[in-house]
Amino acid sequence: MQFTIASLIATAVLGLQMASAAPHAPGSSNAAIISQAQEQNTCGNAHLSCCESTDNSVSLTQEEEEGLLHLLGGTSSVLSDGLLGKYSGCSSLASVEGILGAGGNQGLVSGQCNNHVACCDAGDNELVGFLEPGVAVLKPNSDGIQNGLANVAVPCVPVQVL
């Protein structure tokens, strides 16, 4: 069971690392326009948010270090790269006036958020227990849907805006 969960998380981490390493097209910049549909494709049920700061100095107990996070490389890779960092001061970009137009027609212009862009939990999930220290199990959302084999309670996950 631990190997299955570890391999799923490792695949997700690898996907995020590959996406962030993707080269830009000639003449492109970080001034892309993100539509509401792209936000939905990027974040799913979470909200695209702008966070003021992140704290990557997350420390693990000895028990946590020997668990699932240790299988993923411990604090030397997963946590130090900011993939599970603690974000603070996050506000939904959809709630900032003028960024998302009515019906999503206007789009989100990169540069409106000069800090950290992340997909943050929509808040409709409920923590029901722990698989092991540091890995939480979530109750299905209000629609009774639980996506994935094991859902992990991570409030915000960074997004690479191209």
Swiss-Prot record:
Keyword tRNA-binding: no
Signal peptide: 1-21
S-S pairs: C43-C119, C50-C113, C51-C90, C120-C156
InterPro entries: Hydrophobin
Subcellular location: Secreted; Spore wall
Gene induction: Expressed after 12 to 24 hours post induction of asexual development, which correlates with the development of metulae and phialides. Not expressed in hyphae and strongly induced during development.
Pfam family, one: Hydrophobin
Family stated for the protein in its record: Belongs to the fungal hydrophobin family.
Summary of the function given for this chain in its UniProt record: Aerial growth, conidiation, and dispersal of filamentous fungi in the environment rely upon a capability of their secreting small amphipathic proteins called hydrophobins (HPBs) with low sequence identity. Class I can self-assemble into an outermost layer of rodlet bundles on aerial cell surfaces, conferring cellular hydrophobicity that supports fungal growth, development and dispersal; whereas Class II form highly ordered films at water-air interfaces through intermolecular interactions but contribute nothing to the rodlet structure.
Name recorded for this polypeptide: Class I hydrophobin dewC
Organism name: Emericella nidulans (strain FGSC A4 / ATCC 38163 / CBS 112.46 / NRRL 194 / M139) (Aspergillus nidulans)
Name of the encoding gene: dewC
